[in-house]
Amino acid sequence: MDYKDLAELIFPDVKDISYYEEKYPERNLQEGAVVTRFAPSPTGFVHIGGLYQALVARTVAKKTGGVFFLRVEDTDQKREVENGVTGIVNSLKDFDMAPDEGMISDTEEIGNYGPYKQSLRKEIYQAYAKYLISQGKAYPCFCTQEELDEIRQKQESAKIRPGYYGVWAKCRNLTVEESAEKIKNGEPYIIRFKSPGREDRKIKHKDVIKGNVDFPENDLDIVIIKADGLPTYHFAHAVDDHLMHTTHVIRSDEWLSSVPLHLQLFHELGFKAPKYAHISPIMKNDNGGKRKLSKRKDPEAAVEYYKKEGIPSEAVKEYLLNIANSTFENWRKANPDKSIDEFDFQLNKMSVSGALFDMIKLLDIGKTVISKMTAEEVYNYSLIWAKEYDEELAKMLEDKEYALKVFGIERGNKKPRKDISKWSDVMYNIGYMYDDEFYGKVNEYPYQVISDKEDIAKILDLYISKYYNESDDKQTWFDKIKELAVEMGYAGEVKEFKANPGMYKAHVGDVSTVLRVALTARTNTPDMYEIMQVLGKNRIAKRLEVAKENLK
């Protein structure tokens, strides 16, 4: 009996690997095209770090005319959560990052290199495991959990490196006949890789991001096929990325130490290894120290958080590119109106150390992104968000014609309004334009410099009775406020007041503030002329009257 007989005994009904090599031929892509993948496990919510990896992988593929695909690594089925795959697929859709190939729903996929769900590729992995066994490069291991625990305890007592290797690999040196006998006797087993490595030898590896890295060779006889017949991550990665013709594996740097093993697997399987690019994690400032964004501690670690907050997907992607390449910020300053797809992203320019997450910076980008949208776009995005997360806002936006006027205030100017950073800001920033919201929440009027109640009442009275005309253009409108200011003993120009502060009670800007506060209960709003044009004469008259009543 030889290795081939043993392989046939273990996997009698699987196809020869030549079948799969023919089924998944080289991709017909232009020279230099990069093939990348996002390969998450459906074991919980999608982490912002996962989205970061996916964005980088997709950007690199798109830039080179390559392919970006989604593969679901669901071989650890005990940890799989309900709707885990759906959550992954929807997260990519939400950020306009749908893959060129792979899973497009929990059960549907597109592309010619599937299945793209590892649990459906069991026979493929077994075919390649059979090949390794037939070559004497893998073997069945019959060690029980108790025996493995005993090995670990002995290693700990002797203070030597733990693991299944060398003299500790009890089943490595079983003869073919001994292994066959145990299998025929019904002893349970798994399949281990027979590592040709030695820990006292070094390998040199050039990571696309980290640069040159030295590692000890892998000498562990790792499990490649588990008792349930499914592969481990390491083995599935090698087989899948070979058959799917991945050219660049872009993943978290927590996998950097696995490179020696993965390169060894590729070599022993006779595959060409892909290039590896290990991304540093996104960090958080925690009391002066740096730590990884935590699923447990940080709500912003979950991709779902950004959707609930209503932070535009374009802003999140722009922010992630900002921390991915240090050249992005200068590019954006030079090209304020270009799509992020036009940025010349460089994988090898990514930071070797983890970037600090900056929510203030992200929200600032959100303001810029929203400021460039049309009123119609802002309305549509706000309504989509509100229907899922804010019933009151959704009801408010039912009058589309009025809402478009509200969102049109200071939009389309050379310097458009930048008060909305996320869709959850919308209610706060436009609520005062709606009577139900305004009267339901106004409880004080912060008038600022002019605080004398008689003066305030007179300003409001004179304005509506003598000066306001809804057909006035902006210059005429402001000239009339100046006239009102002068009539009331205030400076008609700010510079007049600054030159002779003793001659005036205040200036035209302070009079404008009285009107602003009376109409909006805010001291800071977008352009008052535009606000008043949208509110209209009847609303304005009523609000000024209510403000006067509030003075009593």
State where each predicted segment sits.
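N-terminal Rossmann-like or analogous alpha/beta NTP/dinucleotide-binding catalytic cores
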Residues: 2-157, 257-271, 315
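Short amphipathic alpha-helical segments and their helix-coil junctions
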Residues: 33-37, 69, 299, 339-347, ...
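Glycine- and acidic
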Residues: 36-43, 69-74, 243-249, 300-302, ...
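Residue-level signal for inorganic ion chemistry
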Residues: 57, 88, 132, 136, ...
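A generic secondary-structure signal for well-formed alpha-helical elements
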Residues: 92-99, 133-140, 152-155, 159-162, ...
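Active-site cores that bind ATP or allylic diphosphates and position pyrophosphate for catalysis
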Residues: 139-278, 283-293, 302, 460-471, ...
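Catalytic adenosine-cofactor/nucleotide-binding cores of aminoacyl-tRNA synthetases and other
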Residues: 269-450, 520-552
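Helix-rich, typically C-terminal accessory recognition domains appended to large enzymatic cores
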Residues: 479-488, 492-535, 539
